[in-house]
Curated annotation (Swiss-Prot):
<feature type="domain" description="WAP 1">
    <location>
        <begin position="27"/>
        <end position="73"/>
    </location>
</feature>
<keyword id="KW-0494">Milk protein</keyword>
<dbReference type="GO" id="GO:0004867">
    <property type="term" value="F:serine-type endopeptidase inhibitor activity"/>
</dbReference>
<protein>
    <recommendedName>
        <fullName>Whey acidic protein</fullName>
    </recommendedName>
</protein>
<feature type="disulfide bond">
    <location>
        <begin position="45"/>
        <end position="65"/>
    </location>
</feature>
<feature type="signal peptide">
    <location>
        <begin position="1"/>
        <end position="19"/>
    </location>
</feature>
<keyword id="KW-0964">Secreted</keyword>
<dbReference type="GO" id="GO:0045087">
    <property type="term" value="P:innate immune response"/>
</dbReference>
<dbReference type="InterPro" id="IPR008197">
    <property type="entry name" value="WAP_dom"/>
</dbReference>
<feature type="domain" description="WAP 2">
    <location>
        <begin position="76"/>
        <end position="127"/>
    </location>
</feature>
<dbReference type="InterPro" id="IPR036645">
    <property type="entry name" value="Elafin-like_sf"/>
</dbReference>
<dbReference type="Pfam" id="PF00095">
    <property type="entry name" value="WAP"/>
</dbReference>
<feature type="disulfide bond">
    <location>
        <begin position="102"/>
        <end position="114"/>
    </location>
</feature>
<feature type="disulfide bond">
    <location>
        <begin position="83"/>
        <end position="115"/>
    </location>
</feature>
<dbReference type="GO" id="GO:0030414">
    <property type="term" value="F:peptidase inhibitor activity"/>
</dbReference>
<comment type="function">
    <text>Could be a protease inhibitor.</text>
</comment>
<dbReference type="GO" id="GO:0019731">
    <property type="term" value="P:antibacterial humoral response"/>
</dbReference>
Amino acid sequence: MRCSISLVLGLLALEVALARNLQEHVFNSVQSMCSDDSFSEDTECINCQTNEECAQNDMCCPSSCGRSCKTPVNIEVQKAGRCPWNPIQMIAAGPCPKDNPCSIDSDCSGTMKCCKNGCIMSCMDPEPKSPTVISFQ
């Protein structure tokens, strides 16, 4: 019995620590990375050690001549949470507009996600993930 209580308390403490850690971080919906062609021979060798040494939005990336400033590649990162489920929003209330306000999460500000809303995509506040319930018997 003591072992079960200790296990439950340990899991609860871990869940609280992880939840706190997630709240402290702000995730960007677009992540910049060095491109795969960083090692190509035709790269200009402007040596650097950190991103701060590079002009504008360039990054200090590995290259054929050590490390040099390169234009990064932006990769879409999906924002936390999920789009809210509302069956009424899945049905268009009238004629559909031609343009969507968004097409990917990074088109939306803050923590909002790009979700289906009738016949268009629009920025909406996400639903938090449902907590996982663990039962011990």
